[in-house]
């Protein structure tokens, strides 16, 4: 998949949203190293085989680890208009019962249900799954998660890491998109300066200053718009 122009960016974003919140149930299996070590690959295969065999209108996706490795394999089940349900310690023998419940719009087997997520702040975007199931705890009410604020790992366990469209759907690359749309180098440099982003080589020189010096420098490459500055950590 290539994004060859700015207009295509919005199209890709809509395509990603349609995957995260499709008009049919979505089941996501955590197949990070911890999940795979506890049999998640077998669970994913069982879901795939059973969905195909029954001809079910269910979207299946592999995702990473949500963070509760001791409870793997974790499986997220979402039915349109309802909270996302996080299931734990799911094994292949649970798959039929889960799919039966999803097909009927019922709650999955009680022994597999850990908590619910009604909405999620990806920081770069906000997703509302749905509301309901008052008897279930919210994810942040689970003792292990209580007090946690997910920042760097906020997307783990919810997005398919191999699908860039899903990342774009929740605001991924939005800063780059804004820069390309606005096409105002001076404003971009001022924003970087205001953020006080700096190098880590020892001198701690401000990145915004480096970019400003580069932009002001004379040279044929700059005037052709081919100059590029990289701030590596």
Regions found by a protein language model. Give the residues of each.
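Feature of Fe-S/electron-transfer and energy-metabolism proteins
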Residues: 1-233
């Amino acid at each position: 998949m290539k994004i060859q122009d700015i207009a295509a960016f919005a199209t890709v974003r809509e395509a990603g949203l349609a995957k995260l919140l499709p008009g049919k149930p979505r089941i996501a299996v955590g197949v990070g190293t911890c999940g795979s070590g506890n049999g998640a690959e077998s669970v994913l295969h069982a879901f795939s085989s059973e969905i195909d065999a029954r001809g079910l209108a269910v979207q299946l996706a592999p995702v990473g680890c949500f963070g509760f490795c001791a409870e793997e394999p974790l499986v997220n089940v979402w039915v349109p208009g309802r909270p996302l349900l996080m299931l734990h310690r799911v094994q292949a023998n649970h798959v039929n019962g889960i799919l039966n419940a999803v097909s009927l719009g019922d709650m999955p087997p009680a022994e597999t249900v850990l908590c619910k997520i009604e909405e999620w702040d990806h920081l770069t975007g906000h997703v509302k799954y749905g509301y309901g199931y008052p008897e279930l705890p919210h994810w942040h009410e689970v003792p292990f998660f209580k007090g946690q604020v997910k920042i760097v790992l906020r997307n783990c366990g919810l997005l398919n890491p191999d699908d860039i469209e899903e990342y774009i759907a929740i605001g991924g690359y939005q800063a780059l998109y804004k820069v390309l749309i606005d096409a105002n180098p001076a404003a971009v440099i001022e924003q970087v300066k205001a953020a006080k982003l700096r190098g880590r080589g020892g001198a701690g020189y401000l990145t915004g200053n480096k970019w400003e010096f580069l932009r002001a420098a004379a040279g044929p490459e700059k005037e052709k718009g081919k100059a590029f500055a990289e701030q590596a950590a």
